[in-house]
Amino acid sequence: MNKNFIIAGAVILVLGLAIAIGVTLSSEPVAAGLPEGETTVTGDLLPEFAGENDDNIALGLAAPIFSAPNENSEIVSLEKNGNAKALLFLAHGCGYCQKEVPVVQGFIDSVGVPPGVDVIAIATSIERGRENYPPQKWLADEGWSETQLYDLDREIGNAYGLSASPYWVFLDKDLNVVARRTGNLPADMVGALLIQLGNQ
């Protein structure tokens, strides 16, 4: 057999394998290891969080309605059920978020969630390779006991005006904005806000 033919055949075989491997790698899901499911958002978007002036901008606005997967890939929707909502947006690679979760969970463990309030953690700004990936393992390790949803493409965060994490959005039972806050909140402030929310 011609030596050049053998070499050419080997080159073609190697190239074929390389292409096959490349296709396999490039087609690997970006969200591998994360909960699966479609995220949807409807309604008008909230303006970006405006710091100290935010209450003058966002107070009373109707919140966008969303659906997203929980840690078990079950789709959960924000809906009116007679309870107010405390939405906590978290980024798994954010040091401030890593401090906030045990503070909030500590309050829940010691005092409990006030009647008439649903606390929902929303993992957003999810990036493979950053600390605490995948975020559902991080929240499990922290003992998070409340609803947790996964904003895989940051659609919900963008709709709610997220500019920094951790980011709280408090909604009344009609799903209108009561307050928005960002940064680490101490346990007593978290408790006061949740109690105030439940009393509305």
Tell me the role of every PLM-derived stretch.
Residues A86-L87, V119, W168:
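Hydrophobic beta-strand anchors of alpha/beta hydrolase catalytic cores
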Residues A140-W144, L152-G198:
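Thiol/disulfide oxidoreductase modules built on the thioredoxin-like
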Residues M1-A63:
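N-terminal targeting signals for export/organelle localization
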Residues Q98-E142, L152-A159:
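Structural microenvironment flanking redox-active thiols in thiol-disulfide oxidoreductases
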Residues I57-A58, I65-A86:
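A short beta-strand-turn-helix
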Residues V76-Q98, V104:
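Short active-site neighborhood of thiol/selenol oxidoreductases, capturing the structured segment around
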Residues A62, N83, S163-S165:
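Short, small/polar residue-rich loop motifs at catalytic or cofactor-binding pockets
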